[in-house]
Amino acid sequence: MNSCDFRVFLQEFGTTVHLSLPGSVSEKERLLLKLLMQGMSVTEISQYRNRSAKTISHQKKQLFEKLGIQSDITFWRDIFFQYNPEIISATGSNSHRYINDNHYHHIVTPEAISLALENHEFKPWIQPVFCAQTGVLTGCEVLVRWEHPQTGIIPPDQFIPLAESSGLIVIMTRQLMKQTADILMPVKHLLPDNFHIGINVSAGCFLAAGFEKECLNLVNKLGNDKIKLVLELTERNPIPVTPEARAIFDSLHQHNITFALDDFGTGYATYRYLQAFPVDFIKIDKSFVQMASVDEISGHIVDNIVELARKPGLSIVAEGVETQEQADLMIGKGVHFLQGYLYSPPVPGNKFISEWVMKAGG
């Protein structure tokens, strides 16, 4: 019987579940299974997919019948017994330490973040980015993970908002940039030319004294003729559109430092950025990428984003690519770069070097 690979990241546990599903399971059904495994209810899925709860319930019933799942109560048991999933932690190990999201607020405080910064517990985890046409490694996005000595990996959505509101994000980003340079420095000769290194930047970081110097330090250490630093701007903590901010943009651009609009299409700020600042990349939000093959409206949104980016000559990255169908669709729509769990989750720096840089350079 034909089969298809299926991967889903369960953020609550910090693990990726890998299943081999029957080949008869469609792209739409795999998306539904992913949302169910991530804990979404029928009501939540109906809102997410812009479909009625009755329609989602019917699709869920058909999916359960196809996969031999008896009920919600036996959902996980039936999956584990029938499909023998491979469960891999983000570090690649088989040992896990779990913590319930409800308990994070007892751990994540400004004092705890400050102490963790002193102890260098925040580490860069790196996700590769590939050329859509050739499949060649062309860059990466650097993300931050809190490697807590007692509780294990704490996901960024649990500490980034507090780090931003407390101002500690400036020190965190500075550490992240330095660690990234240290990780890539020994293998910079193996990096392809114009290797893109994306780092998320909040308003606090962008406007902080010395930020431009930190960017130039990273670029100069790895080689301005070798790498291209891409500062990724988000909706969450937008940079104010002021003459002062524009002057910083222009100064960084003169040093060959580029800018990307992250999670594009999800809010007003990214469109305001596009109007006000000289950006170079648009990163299509994963919600549109993952829905484009099963939802006509999402597909049209992707088409509009691609057309919007094409006129000023911006490069386009599709984030959150999880299936080959999604990758093929994005390539067909004219996207330039692909990033997502189909290729690799974010991994620790040493694993990124061994799994991707050494292989690409060899």
Curated annotation (Swiss-Prot):
Residues 42-61 bind DNA. GO terms for molecular function: cyclic-guanylate-specific phosphodiesterase activity; metal ion binding; protein homodimerization activity; transcription cis-regulatory region binding. Substrate binds at Q127, V144, R145, N200, D262, K286, E319, G320, V321, E322, Y341. Its cofactor is Mg(2+); Mn(2+). InterPro entries: Cyclic-di-GMP_PDE-like, EAL_dom, EAL_sf, Sig_transdc_resp-reg_C-effctor, Tscrpt_reg_LuxR_C, WH-like_DNA-bd_sf. GO terms for cellular component: plasma membrane. Changing F206S: Increases catalytic activity. Acts both as an enzyme and as a c-di-GMP sensor to couple transcriptional activity to the c-di-GMP status of the cell. Phosphodiesterase (PDE) that catalyzes the hydrolysis of cyclic-di-GMP (c-di-GMP) to 5'-pGpG. Also acts as a transcription factor to control its own expression. Is in a fast thermodynamic monomer-homodimer equilibrium. Dimerization is required for PDE activity. Dimerization affinity is increased about 100-fold upon substrate binding. This is Cyclic di-GMP phosphodiesterase PdeL. It comes from Escherichia coli (strain K12). The lineage of its organism: Bacteria, Pseudomonadati, Pseudomonadota, Gammaproteobacteria, Enterobacterales.
